[in-house]
């Protein structure tokens, strides 16, 4: 009996083993694996295989008993399937809703060191980091669709990162942390409607499983990856502030590495993609490696390029603490939407190539050492009050900071800022408050050197010229009065010279303002220091009242009466009294006014309507005639002490006298721009009506001086605006010619 029972048990086990071996042979696995599998493994693999048929009911076609109705293209895909798995830098896996691994490709052993047989049929939770269990559960959770009765089967995309157990040696494992390796998984959750029409399954859906591909992120030696032409690398701190960038970033995005260093990556990413980048950044800090979604990196010239980044946290070799982030970035497209500005950096890069700040000149800096301490005092840069115009530069020039008077209240708080492009034929000036700069009249182009060049450009006046009234003048002084009084008071647009000139070796402080009123022919050759610049009785400048300006900024506002308006009214009254005396003399009326200073005759007329003046902005090759033709405001002129007047005196004797022409004819003027000066500090001659001090004109000049001046005015009765052109002493950043518009008497 015992022998029979032993034989029966042995036979039963042999049959059982034989059935298991037969079952193992049916598994779609290599015989080398199935022949060494135990019974439990065979049962586990078989169960997984059967569940896979639920996920893919059509299976492999004919091999599962179904008639093949596939096209030739699908057959080619099946034939290439095994080869695709070998070339895939990752592995494919299918996970059931309960977490069981239904299938995993044999390439998983290359990345994890775990065999296909070992992983299949076991729970995925056994091979992932405990901190990732909740995330995996959320991935496997399905949601009911909104219109379930219209959909029989649908898929939900999934993309996530798992820290999976890795048993490879350190030399082959890449970057691992505590025996876990970061795997980027992407795939879809398959949802299908129940095939049973009976209750309670009618209209319900079942979660079939997750089908995904796992990719190993770049190993720790990211810097050893060969960077192709469409790749660049950067190193950043843990808060994504860029520390180092590869030089290829300039070719791909337009930004030089130094433009991006010390700036956060979020600053240069499209605002719609910052959320995805933030999520990737969070995963990177938690798991150590991440692959970002496709995001738009803003290009310097506008628009963006599509980028995907593979980021890794590098740990300190000694302390094993996170040290920095190293990212390899793949630029996937060319620049899209070029010219579309989405950030301030892009806007700054497309602004005109001019700036208020002149580049420092070493020669000028060396010569500036011996100057007074006051002239070298730097003041804090003031911000422009016109913040609603971000497209224009708001910084002030360096010479303005050097001025001992600082800036005047009107220039700092109310005057329109002038933009000047000092290079190129199309140099022009634009006011900020001019909504349409095209309405301005562009006349009288100036050549680079008017003494040698005869090339002038004609300008036909049109209706736009009539609309070009001087808004700046009306803003400061109100509506100008018609007639000669307006010409007398308003035709004094004075331009200061540049700050320094490397050629003559004189700095700005040693050059007196080249400002004068051209008198008649009888007194043309006589110049003295007082005729060039008005001086106060104490030897200082008549306009040396910067402290008083700063104390009366609010009162000097053009919105309420100020010293400017008071002095203008007094000056206009004085001019009217002088004209009453001038009317006693007969005016010659038969000789027209000839063009002066080598200007084309086409720009002059024989009469001028007694009406409100118009603003004429002249566009020339390298110079602008405007209310303030230089970005250097008039307040930067130094105090005209006697030792600073030699330069201006020589200039006035030699050049102004040589270019002045005798004027005869009727009360005719050329339509040269008669503009209000943008800056109130004008250093005029005897009739300086715009001197913004607390003195009246009687305080600045004696009675005999005014009497002599009145007699000189009675000698001739015509008015003239003589445009004197002079080659400017060019300083770095201020190129072009200097223009002085004066009126002679």
Swiss-Prot record:
Cellular-component GO terms for this entry: nucleus
Chain intervals for the UniProt region annotation (Disordered): 350-413, 529-563
SMART domains linked: PAC, PAS
Residue ranges of domain bHLH in the record: 1-53
PAS domain segment(s): 77-147, 218-288
PANTHER family xref list: HYPOXIA-INDUCIBLE FACTOR 1 ALPHA, SINGLE-MINDED HOMOLOG 1
Name this protein carries in UniProt: Single-minded homolog 1-A
Source organism of this protein record: Danio rerio
């Amino acid at each position: 009996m015992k022998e029979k029972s032993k034989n029966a048990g042995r036979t039963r086990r042999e049959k059982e083993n034989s059935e298991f071996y037969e079952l193992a042979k049916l598994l779609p696995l290599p015989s080398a694996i199935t022949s060494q599998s135990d019974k439990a493994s065979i049962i586990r693999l078989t169960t997984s295989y059967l569940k896979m048929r639920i996920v893919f009911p059509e299976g492999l076609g004919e091999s599962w008993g179904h008639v093949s109705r596939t096209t030739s293209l699908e057959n080619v895909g099946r034939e290439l399937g095994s080869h695709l798995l070998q070339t895939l830098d990752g592995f494919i896996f299918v996970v059931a809703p309960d977490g069981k691994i239904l299938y995993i490709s044999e390439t998983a052993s290359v990345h994890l060191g775990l065999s296909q047989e070992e992983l299949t049929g076991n729970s995925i939770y056994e091979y992932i980091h405990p901190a990732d269990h909740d995330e995996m559960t959320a991935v496997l959770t399905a949601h009911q669709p909104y219109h379930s009765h219209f959909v029989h089967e649908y898929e939900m995309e999934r993309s996530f990162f798992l820290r999976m157990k890795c048993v490879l040696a350190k030399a082959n494992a890449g970057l691992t942390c505590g025996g876990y390796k970061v795997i980027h998984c992407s795939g879809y959750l398959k949802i299908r409607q129940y095939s049973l029409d009976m209750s309670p399954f009618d209209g319900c859906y079942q979660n079939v499983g997750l089908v995904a591909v796992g990719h190993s992120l770049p190993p720790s030696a990211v810097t050893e990856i060969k960077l192709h032409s469409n790749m660049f690398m950067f190193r950043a701190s843990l808060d994504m502030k860029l520390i180092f960038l590869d030089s290829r970033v300039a070719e791909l995005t337009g930004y030089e590495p130094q433009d991006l260093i010390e700036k956060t990556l979020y600053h240069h990413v499209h605002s719609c993609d910052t959320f995805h980048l933030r999520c990737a950044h969070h995963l990177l800090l938690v798991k150590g490696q991440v692959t970002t979604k496709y995001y738009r990196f803003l290009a310097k010239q506008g628009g963006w390029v599509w980028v995907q980044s593979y980021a890794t946290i590098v740990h300190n070799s000694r302390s094993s603490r996170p040290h920095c982030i190293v990212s390899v970035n793949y630029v996937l497209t060319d620049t899209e939407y070029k010219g579309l500005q989405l950030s301030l950096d892009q806007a700054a890069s497309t602004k005109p190539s001019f700036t208020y700040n002149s580049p420092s000149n070493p020669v000028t800096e060396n010569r500036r050492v011996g100057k007074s301490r006051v002239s070298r005092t730097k003041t804090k840069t003031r911000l422009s009050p016109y913040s609603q115009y971000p497209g224009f530069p708001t910084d002030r020039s360096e010479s303005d900071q050097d001025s001992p008077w600082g800036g005047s209240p009107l220039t700092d708080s109310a005057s329109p800022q002038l933009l000047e492009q000092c290079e190129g034929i199309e140099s022009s000036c634009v006011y900020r408050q001019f909504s349409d700069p095209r309405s301005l009249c562009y006349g009288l182009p100036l050549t680079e050197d008017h003494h040698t060049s005869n090339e002038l450009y004609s300008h036909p006046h049109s209706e736009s010229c009539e609309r070009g009234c001087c808004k700046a003048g009306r803003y400061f002084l109100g509506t100008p009065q018609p007639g000669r009084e307006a010409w007398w008071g308003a035709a004094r647009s004075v331009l200061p010279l540049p700050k320094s000139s490397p050629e003559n070796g004189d700095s700005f402080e040693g050059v007196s303002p080249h400002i004068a009123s051209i008198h008649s022919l009888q007194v043309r050759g006589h110049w003295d220091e007082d005729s060039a610049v008005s001086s106060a009785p104490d030897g200082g400048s008549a306009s040396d009242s910067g402290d008083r300006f700063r104390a009366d900024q609010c009162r000097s506002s053009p919105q309420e009466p100020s010293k400017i308006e008071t002095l203008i009214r007094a000056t206009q009254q004085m001019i009217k009294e002088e004209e009453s005396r001038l009317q006693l003399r007969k005016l010659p009326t038969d000789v027209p006014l000839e063009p002066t200073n080598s200007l084309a005759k086409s720009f002059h007329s024989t009469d001028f309507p007694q009406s409100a003046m118009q603003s004429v902005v002249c566009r020339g090759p390298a110079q602008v005639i405007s209310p303030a033709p230089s970005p250097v405001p008039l307040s930067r002129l130094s105090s005209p002490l006697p030792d600073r007047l030699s330069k201006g005196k020589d200039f006035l004797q030699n050049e102004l006298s040589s270019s002045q022409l005798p004027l005869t004819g009727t009360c005719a003027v050329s339509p040269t721009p008669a503009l209000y000066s943008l800056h109130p500090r004008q250093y005029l001659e005897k009739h300086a009506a715009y001197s913004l001090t607390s003195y009246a004109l009687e305080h600045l000049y004696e009675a005999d001086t005014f009497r002599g001046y009145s007699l000189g005015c009675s000698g001739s009765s015509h008015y003239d605006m003589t445009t004197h052109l002079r080659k400017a002493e060019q300083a770095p950043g201020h190129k072009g010619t200097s223009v002085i518009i004066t009126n002679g008497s």
